[in-house]
Amino acid sequence: GDYMTDDFSGVPILAVRDDGGRINAFMNVCRHRGARVAQGCGSGKTSFSCPYHGWTYDRTGSLRGIPYEQGFDGIDKVLHGLRRLPVVEKHGMVWVVPTPPAEPDIDRHLNAMAIDLASFGLEKYSHYETRVLNARLNWKLVIDTFLETYHLSVLHKTTIAPILHSNLGTFDGM
């Protein structure tokens, strides 16, 4: 029941784990009138419902409920599930192709970088929180924090410091 939504290249995506723990990816669009069936991320979800007319889909993308279904004489629910997107889970990441029917060849795409990604052990990590900060501040100071890693061994010693070098910096020469 863990799920997340995102927009990638203009395609609204819903990724969700089914009962077996397998990741599924779909276009986050109701097949009736095109409203999004999910927002944000979370866990424990067993179904997703369109906020407009209430069409309901399960974690495998199958259409499970249509309010006043008798008004849709002969509708085949099998043909009106969420549109499935190709998805691969590897190295602790989920890779979705927003333009089916292409299947992602992650090994070929990553090439030698796959060894580096595997060494991070990202599959052992889990999402902690998402924050959006709307504040009046000097964006250059924020960017500088992400371009220098000197602070990692102190500020992030129990999270990312063990997997990153804390004595490197990136400067643009200005």
Segments from the language model and where they lie:
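C-terminal catalytic domain of Rieske-type non-heme iron oxygenases
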Residues: 88, 93-174
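Rieske [2Fe-2S] iron-sulfur-binding domain
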Residues: 2-100, 104-115
